[in-house]
């Protein structure tokens, strides 16, 4: 299923499934909210033998503590609290930079970057990809396809990730914004541009008036 469109395929009765790079034996993981599903028909009998599921979560980083290996996100959970991920809780933790090269998490996870995360179903493995791609553009319009928001920017259409980080009013149509993309080219965060048009206020602290 992609947004509001649904397709159906026939699986072999003994199919194997791989979820976020690890074997899985639970059909609940077959339909990721944000991800891809690849079907493989090894013996060409029109029944798929292998299902490869990539389930992504993309967030904007607020802070990373190298000591306790916690990533704190700007994104909030359903209780309004910052989402936090404890990397030390995983047996396997792999990170890659914008070029897709392996790197130490502490070297590439910085405030303001976007991380795209894949966690295994048994919560023993986590894979992190970092993106620092930012567009400074005017938001032309916003539409929706099911629960997926789509933004027209610079004549192109971009989909937002689930739980996209958008402070109040940052995605107002007609406004200029800093648009942060994740590794898949989807919008992970929208922030008001510092040079966006609007009133600017100031005040005078001291005034000297010379006698004429």
Predicted regions and their residues:
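...the same signal can extend to comparable exposed beta-sheet modules
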Residues: 1-212
